[in-house]
Amino acid sequence: MQKVSLFLSICLICLSFTACQDDLDDVIRPADQLQLNNFVWQGMNIFYVDKSEVPDLADDRFQNEDELFAFLAEFPSPEALFDHLLTPTDRFSIIVSDFRVLEDALNGIRVDNGMRFGLVRITNTNLVFGYVRYVLPNSPAANAGVERGMIFNKVNGVLFTPETDFGALLSGDNYSISLAEFNDGNLVDTDIVIALDKITLTEQAIHVNQIIENEFQKVGYLMYTGFRRNQENELNAAFGNFVAQGIDELVLDLRYNGGGDLRTAVDLSSMITGQFEGSLFATQEYNANFDDEIINFTTQNRAGEGLNSLNLSRVYILTSPSTASASEMVISGLLPYVDVVQIGTNTVGKYQGSITVYDSEDFRRQNATLAHSYALQPLILSLINADGFTDFDDGIIPDIELQENFSNLGILGDVNEPLLRAALEDIGFALDRPAPKLYQPVFGELLMDDNQNQLDYQRMYVEFKK
């Protein structure tokens, strides 16, 4: 197939549906199973980044339409076909039966109680517990008194074990958590039970935004939890304040940031710097259907508005095993140009991006069929930085390794929070307060976090260009 630009004209196939879905409130009419499966195969055949590794996606796999439809008829559902067309190592491509739910997730909207947490197995034991990472303001969890650092080991009275089905246990519209605490490194039950309800919430990507200063230095601290295209103005405003206040250093906290919109990651990297306009940020490598494309550092957002840039030559980035995709691309994209001091633990290792593929003639959202609301979110590209760095399957290794101590998480933004303190000490920032007292350390293996069952979990997505 002749290569074409992905974002020019994708008139590669016209599916059999002709009705349009310009209005989200339009009634969805039942689709024929074969037509649904055809949409899945066509979308994956055109876009899937690993198409060459899937024999059933080869352009010459079927001699005619009858052969293709006979193959499609073997699969009882679009989900079954989609799974069949993925490579064994693909953890991130998904299919959804209602693209409106996916769109909400990508914009930070979901039914939630506002408690962000991780589930951990203590090293060399069968003890499992949850720990609260942070709480969304004005959420049910915040109103119930849940705070960062709280430990819980039961949900609805069910004690956690390595075999617990956490997805099922935590999926209800409401549940209760039973608090526990560490005493000399031992996990001890308390009598405190907190009931939590879920409502529709929109998470603000900027969780903490502050300036830490003394007589000689100003350090900006930004805890950023997701790259959301609908919150670009808030991010630019935060950097506008950093510029106005004249900060000398920046600590960017991405430890709980699983990724999101790639263009927002480029903009954030451009705000941190500013002196590399037009320089290569990354190359987008597609399958053989499309030419590779480049992404450059910029001085404007997608609306054409100027970015507030710091022109820094060094940035500190805090990471954890939950740091993924667009977060990793900020690190990777900046590495060839500035001193990136990474503090924490290895990141996830996600360097591929996806788009939402709708059932329309050009696979865009406009004019999507009324026959169903399915959409695909397949991996369509790999990203390579200006130095050729990619394929970091084991994550990006920190310069200063420091695992979160679950018995002493600290307060986000406080100078004695362990990861932030490590950054300030490396900067040479004079700290008035002494280091906090030592706690019996508690470390463990992260089993899952609260976002793991969400549609936007650790995904990096791009848009069709206009």
Locate the predicted segments by residue.
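Bacterial N-terminal signal peptides that target proteins for export
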Residues: 1-7
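C-terminal "post-core" interaction segments
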Residues: 221-222, 230-237, 242, 249, ...
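C-terminal motif of bacterial Sec signal peptides marking the signal peptidase cleavage site
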Residues: 15-19
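Active-site beta-strand/loop signature of hydrolases that rely on acidic residues for catalysis
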Residues: 255
